C-alpha cells in the first residue's frame, strides 16, 4: 500500500512538472513583434541632434532592438531599395518581445516627450507586424 502511494505520488509530481514545462515552452514560442517606421524628415540636423538620440535611448531602455536602419543619414543606415512603388527616404525596423512591450514603450512618458520633439522635424508612419514562430 505504501509503495502504491509512493508510485502514485511520483506520477502526479511528474505530470505536474511536465505541465509546467509545456507551459514554459509555449510561453517561449511567442513570435516577436516588428515595428516598421517610415520617416519623412524636414530638418535632418535638428532631427539627428534633438530627437534621434532620445528616441533610441528609450527604445533600448524598454527592451526594443533595432533590426534595420535605412535611408539618408544616421549611423549605420543602409540604402532603401524600392522593389515596387516608392520607397520612403528613411525607415527603421525594431523588434519587440510582445505587443504589450511595444505599446508600453510607445505610451511611456519618456518616449512621448521625445516624440513631441521629433514631430517638429519629421512625420512618422508606423505599423506593427507579428513575426512567425
Show where each model-derived region lies.
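Short S/T/G/P-rich N-terminal loop/turn motif that feeds into the first structured element of a domain
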Residues: 4, 14, 18-107, 130-133
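A general structural signal for well-ordered secondary-structure junctions
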Residues: 65, 111-112, 124
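Alpha-helix boundary/capping residues
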Residues: 54, 109-110, 118-121
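C-terminal end-helix/capping segment
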Residues: 118-133
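Bacterial Sec-dependent N-terminal signal peptides
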Residues: 1-8
Amino acid at each position: 500500500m505504501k509503495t502504491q502511494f509512493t508510485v502514485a505520488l511520483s506520477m502526479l509530481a511528474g505530470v505536474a512538472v511536465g505541465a509546467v514545462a509545456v507551459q514554459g515552452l509555449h510561453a517561449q514560442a511567442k513570435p516577436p513583434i516588428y515595428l516598421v517606421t517610415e520617416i519623412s524628415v524636414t530638418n535632418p540636423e535638428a532631427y539627428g541632434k534633438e530627437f534621434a538620440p532620445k528616441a533610441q535611448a528609450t527604445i533600448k531602455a524598454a527592451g526594443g532592438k533595432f533590426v534595420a536602419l535605412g535611408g539618408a543619414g544616421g549611423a549605420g543606415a543602409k540604402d532603401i531599395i524600392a522593389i515596387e512603388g516608392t520607397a520612403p527616404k528613411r525607415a527603421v525596423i525594431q523588434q519587440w518581445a510582445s505587443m504589450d512591450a511595444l505599446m508600453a514603450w510607445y505610451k511611456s512618458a519618456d518616449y512621448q516627450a521625445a516624440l513631441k520633439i521629433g514631430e517638429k522635424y519629421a512625420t512618422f508612419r508606423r505599423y506593427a507586424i507579428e513575426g512567425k514562430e
